[in-house]
C-alpha cells in the first residue's frame, strides 16, 4: 500500500511538470493500461474490476473531450470528439456484454492515436 501511495504522489508530481503534449500522451497510455486490465477482468469474470477499469478508461476519454480546443483544432477537434465519443460507446458495450473484442477495438484506435500524437509531437520538437 505504501508503495502505491508513493507511486501516486510521484505520478502526480510528474503530471504537474509535464508539457500539455506529454500529458495527452500519458492519457493515451493510461487508456491502454486500463483497457488491458479490463480485459483481464473480463477473462477472470471479475465484474467489479471490469466496471472499475471501464469507468477509469471512460473518464480519460471524457477528459480528452473536455480538453479539445475547437477554435484552434477546427475539423480535427470535431473529428476527435466524435472518435472519443465512439470509444466511450464501445466501452459501454464491452461492459454490458462482457465483451473483450470491444475493448480490443478501443485499444487499436488508441494505439493509432498515440502513435500519431507522438509523431506530430516529435515533428514539432524537431522543427523548433
Curated annotation (Swiss-Prot):
One of its GO terms (biological process) is bacterial-type flagellum-dependent cell motility. GO terms for cellular component: cytosol. Keywords: Bacterial flagellum biogenesis, Chaperone, Cytoplasm. InterPro entries: FliS, FliS_sf. Disruption phenotype: Cells are non-motile, flagellar filaments are severely truncated. Strongly reduced levels of secreted flagellins FlaA, FlaB and FlaC. It is found in: Cytoplasm, Cytosol. Required for flagellar assembly and thus bacterial motility. NCBIfam families: fliS (TIGR00208). Interacts with flagellins FlaA, FlaB and FlaC; preferentially binds glycosylated FlaA over non-glycosylated protein. Requires the 10 last residues of FlaA for binding. May form a 3-way complex of flagellin, FliS and FliW simultaneously in which FliS and FliW do not directly interact. Belongs to the FliS family. PANTHER family: FLAGELLAR SECRETION CHAPERONE FLIS. This is Flagellar secretion chaperone FliS.
